[in-house]
C-alpha cells in the first residue's frame, strides 16, 4: 500500500485528526500512477538530490525517496510535521524542514545534503495560490537547479510554456523561458485530489539552459520592458511603452529611435515579440537612455 492510496490517505488524515487549511492551498494527490509518472518525467535516480515543496502527507516524497540520493522537503504547515514523521519513518534519506520556502536560506540548507555536489532537481506539487512567486524565487536564487518538474494549475503551466502570438504568452513566459526551457509533460485531472480543486492541473518540465536564452545588457531592465509591454494586452507596444516611460516629446523621440533600431513597428503588440526581439528592444531603449 502507498501513502497516496485513497484508503491510506483517508486513514492517515483521520488518525491524526488533520483538517485542510485553505490558506495553504492544500490538495493531496491520491493517484499512484500519476506519482510514478511524475518521478519518471523527472528522471530521478541515486545520483540526484531533490528539493520538494509542500510534501503534504508524503505521497510524492515516498516515490522520490525510493529513487533519489536524498530528498529535502519544505513544509510550511507545522501540523503536518508529526504526520510526515509517521508516514516517512522508513526513509533515512529524507529531511523535512518546517519552513516557508520563500523565507528560508536555501543555499545553507543545500549544504546539509550528504553530497551537496550532486545535481539538484525540484520536484513538487506547488500550492496554486503561490506558484509563480515560488518558481521565480527558485529560478532567480542563484542556486543551479538543473531541472524542475512541478505540478501547478494548468492555466499557469500554459502561460509559462506559451510561445509568441498565442493568448497565453506574456511576461511570465519570458521571465521563465529566459532561464529555462518549459514544456507541459501531461495533464492531471482535478478528480485525483483530496479535496478536489476547482481546476485541472499540469505537470510542467523545465530544464535550465546552460546560458540565458538571449544576451541582454541589463537583465532587470529587460524584464521591466517585457512586463511593461503586456500591461494592456490589447494595446500596441507604443501605447504600453509610452504608458510606462512617459508621453513627453523627448520620450516619444527616444522610443521612436529605439523601435526603429530594434526593427519593430510601433503598432505591433507585445504578444508578437520573441525573446530575441524583446532583448533587442530592451538594449535599444537602454541605449537611448530610457
Curated annotation (Swiss-Prot):
Reactions accelerated catalytically: adenosine(1518)/adenosine(1519) in 16S rRNA + 4 S-adenosyl-L-methionine = N(6)-dimethyladenosine(1518)/N(6)-dimethyladenosine(1519) in 16S rRNA + 4 S-adenosyl-L-homocysteine + 4 H(+)
HAMAP family linked: 16SrRNA_methyltr_A
Entry annotated with the keyword Transport: no
PANTHER family: DIMETHYLADENOSINE TRANSFERASE, DIMETHYLADENOSINE TRANSFERASE-RELATED
KW Magnesium (keyword) present: no
Enzyme class, first EC level, given as a word: transferase
Molecular functions (GO terms): 16S rRNA (adenine(1518)-N(6)/adenine(1519)-N(6))-dimethyltransferase activity; RNA binding
Residues annotated for S-adenosyl-L-methionine binding in this entry: 27, 29, 54, 75, 100, 125
Role summary: Specifically dimethylates two adjacent adenosines (A1518 and A1519) in the loop of a conserved hairpin near the 3'-end of 16S rRNA in the 30S particle. May play a critical role in biogenesis of 30S subunits.
InterPro entries, per the entry: KsgA/Erm (IPR001737), rRNA_Ade_diMease-like_C (IPR023165), rRNA_Ade_Mease_Trfase_CS (IPR020596), rRNA_Ade_methylase_Trfase_N (IPR020598), rRNA_adenine_dimethylase (IPR011530), SAM-dependent_MTases_sf (IPR029063)
Subcellular location, record wording: Cytoplasm
GO CC annotations, alphabetized: cytosol
Protein EC: 2.1.1.182
Stored PROSITE patterns: RRNA_A_DIMETH (PS01131), SAM_RNA_A_N6_MT (PS51689)
Keywords, ordered alphabetically: Cytoplasm, Methyltransferase, RNA-binding, rRNA processing, S-adenosyl-L-methionine, Transferase
Family statement: Belongs to the class I-like SAM-binding methyltransferase superfamily. rRNA adenine N(6)-methyltransferase family. RsmA subfamily.
Name this polypeptide is given: Ribosomal RNA small subunit methyltransferase A
